[in-house]
Amino acid sequence: MESGDYDVETKREKLKSVLSQLLADPILADVPRNPTLSDVVTLVSLEKGSAMRLSVVKLDGSSLDVAVMNSATLKDLKLLIKKKVNEMEQANMGHRHISWKHVWSNFCLSCNNEKLLDDNAVLQDVGIRNNSQVTFMPYVMKKGRGRHSKRKKHRLFRSLHKTSS
């Protein structure tokens, strides 16, 4: 090993040591274990007041805290929830597949009992502020003329019943 390689490796180990000490500090408890640049930018923005912290209450009553920029849309929040839940699942149980298409077609987010359905809506425009609580709520997507979609099984049985009469 050349002396230049040794210096780089020594510096890398020293940096890892300093970073682990910093991340162990209780003040930085909200920093993820392996933060991305966007995580750091959001946390800095939170300190400056240009981001907000939200509590997302899941159907089982547990909650998770997320930080989003003040200009974030509902779509941004959904992506952040997906990322956070996937990270938590990975840390707790290894990889477990969650069908987010299924989740968002059967549930929606709500704030103050108001269903949040427009993915392009800016969170602040729909009344979400710093420290707001957002909850999952059962939701059936409507199809066409204002009628709720029906499960295919029921349609099948109904058509069988009509032909036997």
Swiss-Prot record:
One of its GO terms (cellular component) is spliceosomal complex. The keyword Transcription does not apply. The keyword Ribonucleoprotein applies. Coiled coil: none annotated. It holds the Pfam family Ubiquitin_4. Its main location: nucleus. This is U11/U12 small nuclear ribonucleoprotein 25 kDa protein. The lineage of its organism: Eukaryota, Viridiplantae, Streptophyta, Embryophyta, Tracheophyta.
